[in-house]
Amino acid sequence: MSLIKDAQRGLVTEEMKLVAAQEGVTEEFVRKGVAGGHIVIPVSPYRKVKICGIGEGLRTKVNASIGTSSDISDVSVEIEKVRQAELAGADTLMELSTGGDLADIRRQVIAATSLSVGSVPLYQAFIEAAHKKGAVVDMEADDLFRITAEQAKAGTNFMAIHTGINYETMKRLQNQGRHAGLVSRGGAFMTAWMLHNEKENPLYAEFDYLLEIMKEHEVTLSMGNGMRAGAVHDSTDRAAIQELLINAELADKAFNEGVQTIVEGPGHVPIDEIQANVILQKRVTNRKPFYMLGPLVTDIAPGYDDRVAMVGAALSSSYGADFICYVTPAEHLALPTPEEVFEGVISSRIAAHIGDMVKLNKRDDDLEMGHARKALDWDRQYAVAINPKRAKEIRDSRMPADTDGCTMCGDYCAIKIVAKHFNF
């Protein structure tokens, strides 16, 4: 099974038909997008999922990352995070646990959702090595590939694979230096392993073998961003660009083998560099779907990073990013709660919509809201709101004497005043 090969043969699959219906585009548009590597549709032969297209000409999608840590590991809490992410309207999930029984947690998360689920196999491989052998640097390459295959068989739909970290990337990082160091967990694991063992990254060195696993299990490959900046002052540096170029070359190779591929982008980017990052990524990857991690546009707002990321995500989407990884208010501070997961998804959905208003001219809901407000039709306003429940709760908690309006204006509602004298 290969959606790319099917599309290139001219076949419109059921998955492509569903995406076309969801997005309001033609089936041929989706087929051509998949055939050209500009659209991916994560699937799995091992579980039925809610079909979701990601890529050029489609609505910007939002991913919610969940998972335990070595300090907090409660699978029931993670399942509640799944529920909250779904309630908030996430398009996909990533299960990124690093504490507890990792395989069992992932199994339970996958069983609890119909959304496409992504993972980072490298985490489990390194953590198992630490538990069984004493250190993450004692991981065996064979174990990394074994775990990758096991996660694929468990029904994982897409995987972040850190292929772009190699000796050349590390040389760029060493020569340039950084203000905030290396903040990607996968990047840190792999860099430490390479330096300790004096070996090339097996995901890069044995990329052909990795592709065989991806092809066999129809997993969508997400080219991981292990060299992403962890501070705006490190944004768009030589190490990040080197990794992007390597990932772009490998993404082309994956596509030629029939493996659907996404390329991940940076996480901390000042506003004036966002457009350049999107243009560069789209150009060097031949317009493959772009997965932005946030991005955060300033580093001084811990506790409010979901709002900071809204700014970056809205701009990224407007310039052409296809996929946004949410950020919660707990970013840089703690493992998020289910409530913070909900807030993070809502924030990212708002940002994605703002971007799509520009990128795809998707403004019908905003037009409907304008009409509903003019008519003082509160039920219509709630229906079109991105979070109807919250909008209704706020108004209901402070109901006006005149139930047509709200307590913001009371008797002096501009809409009601004008309506008495002017019909337009």
Swiss-Prot record:
Zn(2+) binds at H268, H332. Transmembrane segments: none annotated. Pathway: Cofactor biosynthesis; thiamine diphosphate biosynthesis. Substrate binds at M94, Y123, H162, S184, R185, G186, N225, G226, M227, R228, E264, Y291. Its cofactor is [4Fe-4S] cluster. [4Fe-4S] cluster binds at C406, C409, C413. It catalyses: 5-amino-1-(5-phospho-beta-D-ribosyl)imidazole + S-adenosyl-L-methionine = 4-amino-2-methyl-5-(phosphooxymethyl)pyrimidine + CO + 5'-deoxyadenosine + formate + L-methionine + 3 H(+). Binds 1 [4Fe-4S] cluster per subunit. The cluster is coordinated with 3 cysteines and an exchangeable S-adenosyl-L-methionine. One of its GO terms (biological process) is thiamine diphosphate biosynthetic process. Its EC number is 4.1.99.17. GO terms for molecular function: 4 iron, 4 sulfur cluster binding; carbon-carbon lyase activity; zinc ion binding. InterPro entries: ThiC, ThiC/Bza_core_dom, ThiC/BzaA/B. Keywords: 4Fe-4S, Iron, Iron-sulfur, Lyase, Metal-binding, S-adenosyl-L-methionine, Thiamine biosynthesis, Zinc. Belongs to the ThiC family. Catalyzes the synthesis of the hydroxymethylpyrimidine phosphate (HMP-P) moiety of thiamine from aminoimidazole ribotide (AIR) in a radical S-adenosyl-L-methionine (SAM)-dependent reaction. This is Phosphomethylpyrimidine synthase. It comes from Methanosphaerula palustris (strain ATCC BAA-1556 / DSM 19958 / E1-9c). The lineage of its organism: Archaea, Methanobacteriati, Methanobacteriota, Stenosarchaea group, Methanomicrobia.
